[in-house]
Amino acid sequence: MMKETEDVVLMHLDFLPLKSNVNIHIGNALQMDWASIISPSKLSYIMGNPPFVGQSVRTKDQAHDMNDIWGQGEIETKLDYVICWYKKALDYINTSSTNIEIAFVSTNSICQGESVPTFWKKMIDSGAEIHFAYRSFVWDSEANEKAAVHCVIIGFSNFSRSHTKIIYTEETKTKAEHINPYLLDAPDIWITNRINKPQNGLPKMTTGS
């Protein structure tokens, strides 16, 4: 894509055209103290595309990150690695009186199943409010080996938005009064797993979404 652009504009382009105010920090974002890098009072937005990694494929270091962020043995450590960025970002903005909005691309699994009554319940109890949501879409890229994953984009913060909330579905956008963790214009509801045996005699489901 870069070469094609150069052919069109007839000039060489820098891959990373950073000329001034360069402030890149290299390291594990989940282990770093964000406030030591930049004070939240200097920010208006936090945006990113954190890695999606399921429990069955994460590394030992990633499992360690999950335990550090959520606590050893907590149910959230069984969910997708990407939720660590949500808590890290919310904890960060909760230390400041500045209104900061956050938006992350994530696997859509964080808005399904056990993720909602566990991860999202804790987020909302800690002050999170969803401001906008782009509902499930298939991830696409120019890579030869594309990841087979469905994504969402969720914008949230720790303050109530004064203007309308929006839910995006493909080419359609809909105004919403309230966006719940299922990315619906509806009140927050918490559908928990059942501990009783199925009434129809079928075996219990052990893995699924």
Name the predicted role of every residue range.
Residues 1-14, 18-19, 29-209:
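Signature of N6-adenine DNA methyltransferases within the class I
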Residues 22:
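Short, conserved active-site loop motifs that form the nucleotide-linked donor/cofactor pocket
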Residues 25-26:
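Conserved residues in the N-terminal Rossmann fold of short-chain dehydrogenase/reductase
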